[in-house]
Amino acid sequence: MATATGVAEERLLAALAYLQCAVGCAVFARNRQTNSVYGRHALPSHRLRVPARAAWVVQELPSLALPLYQYASESAPRLRSAPNCILLAMFLVHYGHRCLIYPFLMRGGKPMPLLACTMAIMFCTCNGYLQSRYLSHCAVYADDWVTDPRFLIGFGLWLTGMLINIHSDHILRNLRKPGDTGYKIPRGGLFEYVTAANYFGEIMEWCGYALASWSVQGAAFAFFTFCFLSGRAKEHHEWYLRKFEEYPKFRKIIIPFLF
């Protein structure tokens, strides 16, 4: 039987999920009006910057630490269930790679504006709490949920998306040879079809996670990811078209053959 505290927390986590959707809509609208504040689109006025490798580690850390804390906690009743453990592990694997592997594979990388890094820390803290707390304390699944078609298809999409994301990052890292400083057109993999193959992979990841978790919290995360990364992808696409006359005109922005 749910306690009053448990019911209150479930309502809080649902409210946070809907808030995440609202913020996603605001981010999507803002990205249509102004450029991003980091990477190749950062303005010279952003003088306070953090080294790229350090920024990635610090900003992604909350989404790694919070699930680990829940796994270590003795007061996480839902993690006695296999579906909950697997779903939280999916979240943890992504951020383990993002926090502990990806930054140390980077070659150079422009320093990130402090504002962008701070915003990323806030998001990863809020979302890390939302996803890990929901799966460890609130989400209820049948023991055979891992054989449900929604879970199996979702897990397949998550795994495929993560592999696409990692492979696309590998292609981007290897665009420049030692001593090169300029930008080049990405070739190979899904970059033959879209400008932002790495973003497409990440969106697929979290859509798969949302399907496998079959929750408002998972869906909110996938929705926010699409709102944020689709705007970034559109900026990249327009930038490549301006910079390279030979840029393939048939490439879509982020979804092969569609958008």
UniProtKB/Swiss-Prot annotation:
Protein localization: Microsome membrane; Endoplasmic reticulum membrane
Induction: Its expression is regulated by androgens such as testosterone.
A molecular function GO annotation: 3-oxo-5-alpha-steroid 4-dehydrogenase activity
Pfam families per the UniProt record, alphabetical: Steroid_dh (PF02544)
The protein's Enzyme Commission number: 1.3.1.22
Known role: Converts testosterone into 5-alpha-dihydrotestosterone and progesterone or corticosterone into their corresponding 5-alpha-3-oxosteroids. It plays a central role in sexual differentiation and androgen physiology.
Similarity remark: Belongs to the steroid 5-alpha reductase family.
Protein name (Swiss-Prot/TrEMBL): 3-oxo-5-alpha-steroid 4-dehydrogenase 1
Biological source species: Homo sapiens (Human)
Lineage: Eukaryota, Metazoa, Chordata, Craniata, Vertebrata
